[in-house]
Amino acid sequence: MESPESFSTMFMKPIRHILSEKKSRKIALFLLINTAYMVVEFVAGFMSNSLGLISDACHMLFDCAALAIGLYASYISRLPANHQYNYGRGRFEVLSGYVNAVFLVLVGALIVLESIERILDPQEISTNSLLVVSVGGLLVNIVGLIFFHEEHHHAHGGSGIFLHVLADTMGSVGVVISTLLIKYKGWLVADPASSIFISILIIASVIPLLRNSAEILLQRVPRAHRQDLKEAMRNILKTKGVCSIQRLHVWSFTNSDVVATLHLLVSADSDKTDTKLQVSRLLEDAGVKDWTLQVESVNS
């Protein structure tokens, strides 16, 4: 049975953290609105047999998951390191993002396959409540654009949320247009065509997340710092007393934390302390936040 302390750690503390910050409260409010309307779209989509509306609800599901992960990660990443998690728990966001991205790519692919089947064999769609629900989804996304328009210009995290909502808005526009074409023109093919459009938006929006999170988990040298690191290595080799660089390893622990380990061979008459200081400055200038240096003297 879960203890009260465990319940507080898992749920109450993150909630208090979210409510204590204005930006987090804004994200949480939009998450609640988005989640509620996502359920409405799923129910209406299944009742009306509209694959386009179900696809839009899946896109909203992705955004809800991304918002929830971001909120929880903002709390858990601030927890101090301990004997079990020596680096802290910053990779929670990376791992969750990877799982989320894989799931959405699979969902997008399945929707495309189902859409192709419906293009070949169009099915009747009930438009009685479809237009109202699809317009409502568009209005929810417009509210999101207004919510995050300011953060779009000031913060990378806010910009990411804004772009997710913008893609959602485009998907909602597609659903509204397809609904109008079905209602007034009888073009049943508009629904699966809209679904394919939304699926492409879903996959296109998650591919960068999938690639980035996979590269972090595989400990790839971070793309954003590659040129700076090359320049830093050249400057390290020019440092007085440095003979060579051995066993260089650079990787990202999180999206923003770059880690490096370095084994330097220096001349026997060089000042190791001064060499470490100069090399540390060069690594810091290259964007490395945590590094381990091993300096070994060799005879000239």
Curated annotation (Swiss-Prot):
Membrane topology: Multi-pass membrane protein
Alphabetized GO MF terms: metal ion transmembrane transporter activity; zinc ion transmembrane transporter activity
Name of this protein: Metal tolerance protein 12
General function of this protein: Involved in sequestration of excess metal in the cytoplasm into vacuoles to maintain metal homeostasis.
Keywords, in A-Z order: Ion transport, Membrane, Transmembrane, Transmembrane helix, Transport, Vacuole
Keyword Transport: yes
Gene Ontology BP term (one): metal ion transport
Residues passing through the membrane, by range: 27-47, 51-71, 92-112, 129-149, 161-181, 187-207
Record-stated family: Belongs to the cation diffusion facilitator (CDF) transporter (TC 2.A.4) family. SLC30A subfamily.
Entry's localization field: Vacuole membrane
Keyword Mitochondrion: no
Region forming the signal peptide: none
GO cellular component, one term: Golgi apparatus
Segments on the Cytoplasmic face: 1-26, 72-91, 150-160, 208-300
InterPro entries from the UniProt entry: Cation_efflux, Cation_efflux_TMD_sf, Msc2-like
Vacuolar side: 48-50, 113-128, 182-186
